[in-house]
A protein has these predicted regions:
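Conserved short histidine dyad/triad with adjacent acidic residue
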Residues: 2-19
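Ligand-binding loop in jelly-roll beta-barrel domains
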Residues: 60-83
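Conserved alpha-helix/loop element of class I SAM-dependent methyltransferases that forms part
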Residues: 91-109
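Conserved SAM/SAH-binding loop
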Residues: 119
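Conserved SAM-binding motif I beta-strand of class I
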Residues: 135-140
Length: 141
């Protein structure tokens, strides 16, 4: 949880999210003045957000900054990505194999065995697919 005193300075300067990463700022208390920018740092739009008027998801690679906050601000930042990128972004595993991604729309879930799984990137992806997910046994040889 950030307060007016603990918001990192980098978020008050122009910055953008990484490719494939969405940001979501949740405001619990107070107000925050926020600007969307172009790549040159020119303000494209400015908004005031609060607990009643939450900021939208910030698109990947969108330039933005926190302009100012009220003294009582309490907020928290979370990052989101596509399921196939999660373990790559969070744990630096190699990306999910392209053939697994191509087959995903046709899979119904169930059980899977991943022999020679390495660090488990494909098994982890298949396991996280929710209702269509797999119970996966993974063995590296």
């Amino acid at each position: 949880m950030w307060t007016a005193q603990s918001i990192p300075q980098g978020f008050k300067n122009p910055h953008n999210t990484k490719a494939g990463t969405w940001a979501k700022l949740k405001i619990y208390q107070g107000e925050l003045r926020f600007a969307f920018l172009d790549e040159a740092g020119v303000v494209q739009s400015e908004h005031i957000f609060s607990a009643e008027q939450q900021p939208p998801f910030i698109e990947p690679q969108a330039w933005h900054k926190i302009v100012s906050t009220s003294g009582d601000i309490e907020c928290q930042l979370q990052f989101y990505c596509m399921p196939q990128d999660y373990f790559y972004k969070k744990y630096q595993l190699s990306p999910t194999h392209s053939e697994i991604l191509a087959a995903t729309p046709y899979l119904q879930g169930g059980r899977a065995l991943d022999v020679g799984c390495g660090q488990g990137r494909n098994a982890l992806y298949l396991n996280q697919l929710g209702q269509q997910g797999f119970e996966v046994d993974a063995w590296d040889v």
